[in-house]
Amino acid sequence: MKFKLIAEYFDRLEKISSRIQLTSLLSDLFKNTEREVIDKVVYLIQGRLWPDFTGMPEIGMGEKFLIKAIAMAYGNKEEEVEKLYKNIGDLGEVAYSLRSKVKGVSILSFVGGNQEAGELDVMEVYNELVKIATSTGEGSRDIKIRIFAGLIKKATPIEAKYLVRFVEGRLRLGIGDATVLDALAITFGGSADYRPIVERAYNLRADLGDIARVIATEGIEKLKNISPTPGIPIRPMLAERLPDPEEIMEKMNGKALVDYKYDGERAQIHRKGDKVTIFSRRMENITDQYIDVTEYVKQFVKGDNFIVEGEIVPVDPESGEMRPFQELMHRRRKNNIAEAIKEYPVNLFLFDLMFFEGEDYTTKPLPERRAKLEEILASNDKVHIASHIIADRVDKLREYFYQAISEGAEGVMVKSIGPDSIYQAGSRGWLWIKLKRDYQSEMADTVDLVVVGAFYGKGKRGGKFSSLLMAAYNPEKDVFETVCKVASGFSDQELDEMQKKINELKREQKHPRVVSDMIPDVWVSPTLVAEVIGAEITISPLHTCCRGEKGGLSIRFPRFIRWRDDKSPEDATTNQEIMEMYSKQLKKIEEKPVDENI
């Protein structure tokens, strides 16, 4: 399959903002994609070479490397490329412009002989990009530049444009996983009615390229038989939130299992034979940060093939008391991990079992999952079952909540124990409800919002980003709707971090998945997630979250709490959750029903 066809579709997709049109065109691309490369095409659409959970390296070519490669490919001086880049502001367009001026293919040391421009095929492109990503050690920088220069030299202008953007991490297609799932269902199932089957398979095996390969080569019926696979993460089950214990117990029909909600890092732990792998909430491979935890699991959790879930929590080695979540940040550094492991010890608190020795436990009710989890855990002081009770009264839930807070937990997770209490992978529902600490605010809880824009500061902050445009996620439309502008709560260190984060993700135009009336100084690709608290939720004509006749919903006096690197944009607080918080706030504060006209 020719890569030029992919590039031409990318060019068309980039110009579309309607999700319906995006889905239709993406489906058309899949129909024209050869079955043996469809997984690679899906990865390219996602802007990656492989799923994050593989732990494989990224491309590793920054702006300066790309400028050198473009100059080498087209016979220009680096200064000329830099000047053109300053004028155009897009290295992909720079490559397109320079390649358009080159006639034929000049001599360049590159494996591939005298291949003519436009003859690149998808597998050739993919394999060369893999070589670039996996090139390490002495001289790897020059190898990466030379390989990429050779690749774009053989490319047509449109291919060069999207190859550069891919390597730079700026594809700008505006396509989320939900849109890909819709397109796969339409292409290989015949209609969007098959979306639940495709989505369930993806929730249990979070490798979108592999799901595309299975449905394209073996048919949609094959997806119905997909079950969890150790080594491939399951999309985590998510909880709803409520501030009132009485209302929570009503939702649970008067009886529920109540776990501590630990202030740690949620972890999905897979064992396949002798290999133990740990995935974050975002399904990234974080095994290297928790080598000690892998050893604990091997020692104390019985079985050779299983998937369990829990919370990794920093603890005081002397007292065993829980320590602040921030201590885990020390384990994210690339150097001296062994020292960090020794200095910042952790315990693992398990709360679920999804797969054990060939059996899918996601379809079993929670009491059965928990009983098996307790059965396979040997007594020890490193790995524990999450502290829990069975609550059948509101006062019992309330007392346990205060006990959890007093012992350093964030709150509690209240979980259904009924016959339908399955593990809903990738879904947010009322089977789990979180009750967190009251922040002494009209907002009963923090929210996790996505950065979609940034504003420059004034005075001593002049020339630097000092506030962020934040959005909630609308899962029905697969878009991000603005809800507030955050300018307070940042420490000096966090402000410095903000500059780097925003500069890496800034873009000239609004991302197609962002719905905003407010125009920031800089648009940002919706990738970063931050935890935010505010005074209350109000109606605002400036924001688009849950917009109705009177405006959208907005958070008054928002304050930054912390970055949530463990969450993906799609894990952010949803527009519906914001609406529910607003409704409950009105009921509590104004003692009148929610205005249905918003």
UniProtKB/Swiss-Prot annotation:
Keyword ATP-binding applies: yes
Q: Name one Pfam family in it.
A: DNA_ligase_A_N
The keyword Cell membrane appears for this protein:
no
Q: Which UniProt keywords apply?
A: ATP-binding, Cell cycle, Cell division, DNA damage, DNA recombination, DNA repair, DNA replication, Ligase, Magnesium, Metal-binding, Nucleotide-binding
Positions of ATP binding: 259, 266, 281, 311, 351, 428, 434
Disulfide linkages recorded for this protein, renumbered to the chain, are none
**InterPro entries per UniProt:** ATP-dep_DNA_ligase (IPR050191), DNA_ligae_ATP-dep_bac/arc (IPR022865), DNA_ligase_ATP-dep (IPR000977), DNA_ligase_ATP-dep_C (IPR012309), DNA_ligase_ATP-dep_cent (IPR012310), DNA_ligase_ATP-dep_CS (IPR016059), DNA_ligase_ATP-dep_N (IPR012308), DNA_ligase_N_sf (IPR036599)
User: Known EC number(s)?
Assistant: 6.5.1.1
The catalytic activity, as recorded, is:
ATP + (deoxyribonucleotide)n-3'-hydroxyl + 5'-phospho-(deoxyribonucleotide)m = (deoxyribonucleotide)n+m + AMP + diphosphate
| Annotated catalytic residues | 261
Give the superkingdom in one word: Archaea
Q: Name one molecular function that GO assigns to this entry.
A: DNA binding
**What's a single GO BP term from this record?**
lagging strand elongation
Q: Which cofactor does it need?
A: Mg(2+)
PANTHER family from the xrefs? DNA LIGASE 1, DNA LIGASE 1/3 FAMILY MEMBER
State the family named in the UniProt similarity comment for this chain.
Belongs to the ATP-dependent DNA ligase family.
Say what the protein does.
Answer: DNA ligase that seals nicks in double-stranded DNA during DNA replication, DNA recombination and DNA repair.
Q: Which NCBIfam families match?
A: dnl1
Stated name of the protein: DNA ligase
Q: Which gene encodes it?
A: lig
